[in-house]
């Protein structure tokens, strides 16, 4: 089958470098490589050069850091979305954005297909493809890992040699990693056995080993406006700068290390270690402010929304009507989430050290045991009688006197 142009999600790794000549051989097509910068801090000049050497006709380097932070990370933060109680969705949030950029370039280049290097066992194939289907339903999607005969890293290296492509790739001796401005994940090797404790000295790349820290605690203040962090220690910052600042602060104190066995969308469990220093601080601070500013009913209902929101993000359904509708609800709740939270960081732990807000629902005169004008304690009796009436009736009808 001949195609004119194929847009490829390119990372510069072995898999996507092999895909370029493979696409040209099997589809007799021009391959346009697209690298999306979501804060992974790669050598993009070297990646661009590698793409051309393996046969790409054109290479796009798309800087999407600001969009990633402001339009994907912060909405998820406001929702309080955490997958299965531990995973802060770093990879999950990035994939729909990358797919969106692929679609934009495919339209610009009038491409016939979009290709990606995700394997047939992981979540990313789903995240890429459902996003592409949502944004460009008519385009063909090519997933080489599901159709080619290359079964191993050695097969891939031999394929490049056969094609006369001489690019050195290091022997795979490290963990499989995925990084962006929000997090860095580690999978494979000894982590595949959930009984093995991670060797933090070997695994961690951005966060200091909390078991070996002897540093003094550090206090940090974060200010929010409508649920969005805008200041760190009194200094106004844009989203990218703010997250980088908190990543540095948090990593110095071993904050944000999560060892997770998660349920993949495709039916299996996987184990990974995640470093999310700045994100962990933001989630903690944001929640503390919500405790102060949200009423009981809204806070409790929002907790239920957060679970479903996290599932949608994890499953790659960022552009689904439900995710967008839930975000509209979240945005309404965040109108009153304004104020400052003070935290203390020490040896991998976060401690609350104060919070204040112009929208605080905490009123000292109501909470105190002293007499006040707003709350008449005698009113409680009638409330309890009515609140407990269903249980009283049930007991009268169904419980025996000697129970």
Swiss-Prot record:
ATP binds at residues 9-17, 117. It comes from the Bacteria. GO terms for cellular component: cytoplasm. Pathway: Amino-acid biosynthesis; L-arginine biosynthesis; L-arginine from L-ornithine and carbamoyl phosphate: step 2/3. It is found in: Cytoplasm. Its EC number is 6.3.4.5. Keywords: Amino-acid biosynthesis, Arginine biosynthesis, ATP-binding, Cytoplasm, Ligase, Nucleotide-binding. InterPro entries: Arginosuc_syn_C (IPR048268), Arginosuc_syn_N (IPR048267), Arginosuc_synth (IPR001518), Arginosuc_synth_CS (IPR018223), Arginosuc_synth_type_1_subfam (IPR023434), AS_cat/multimer_dom_body (IPR024074), Rossmann-like_a/b/a_fold (IPR014729). One of its GO terms (biological process) is urea cycle. The keyword RNA-binding does not apply. L-aspartate binds at residues 119, 123-124. Belongs to the argininosuccinate synthase family. Type 1 subfamily. PANTHER family: ARGININOSUCCINATE SYNTHASE. This is Argininosuccinate synthase. The gene is argG.
